[in-house]
Design a protein with these regions (language model features):
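Glycine-rich phosphate-binding loops of nucleotide-dependent enzymes
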Residues: 1-217
Length: 217
């Protein structure tokens, strides 16, 4: 119910945004038809609508979670053809899903592992062994950078509040140094104080030059 101008008061509206990072042309899937838009560096593009309006379906088709039936996607001017969400991650397009419990956190893992798992490709050697020192470092950086309230990284993530669980998911994907960050209902089910933190966080991402897609009902 808040005015978006108040929510994103931290954004400098006089600042010129950068080049087009993500471009979608006539994208179609079994769940949508002919979606087209651009997202520039330092820009927050919002998708709003009722459930079933296609706001989540658009990004699912972009990241390879749903099959495409038509259209094209470009990342920095080059074709982006993601068959799976992993393809999107490798190319610098990451998504924080709407359903935190089913699609976001990994309940049986610790806070630290939930953060570092997004960077598993970078911290695993050719023999499949994980660099545990680097893994811990990523967890500590995520905890500090996103103000995750937990006594230690070994604590099960399910014991954290909803807001801190969500911060851990954001930390996971931001540790991969993405170019495009997709946030699907990022403040759903978290308290008012945490919501304010998230809005400020999104403003900071944009100021740093990240291309952001924000989905909200």
């Amino acid at each position: 119910g808040r005015d978006l101008g108040d929510v994103f008061s931290g954004l400098d509206r006089n600042k010129t945004v950068g080049d087009v990072v993500l471009e979608v042309k006539n994208l179609s899937s079994p769940f949508l038809k002919d979606a087209s838009f651009q997202v520039r560096a330092g820009e927050v593009v919002g998708f709003s609508g009722l459930v079933g309006a296609g706001r989540t379906e658009v990004v699912r088709a972009i990241i390879g979670a749903d099959p495409r039936t038509g259209g094209k996607v470009f990342l920095n001017g080059k074709p982006l053809n993601c068959r799976t969400p992993h393809d999107a991650i490798v190319n610098g397009v990451v998504m924080v899903p709407e359903d935190r419990k089913l699609q976001g956190i990994i309940p049986r893992m610790s806070v630290g592992r939930n953060i570092s798992i997004g960077s598993l490709d970078q911290i695993t050697n050719r023999l499949g062994f994980v660099n545990t020192r680097r893994e811990e470092q990523i967890g500590l950086e995520g905890k500090a950078n996103f103000n995750i309230k937990t006594p230690d990284l070994e604590k099960p993530i399910v014991e954290l509040s909803g807001g801190n669980q969500q911060k851990a998911i954001v930390a996971r994907w931001m540790s991969t140094k993405p170019e495009v960050l997709i946030l699907d209902e990022p403040t759903k089910g978290i308290d008012v104080g945490a919501k304010s933190e998230f809005y400020n966080m999104i403003c900071e991402f944009a100021k740093e030059g990240l291309a952001v897609i924000l989905i909200s009902s």
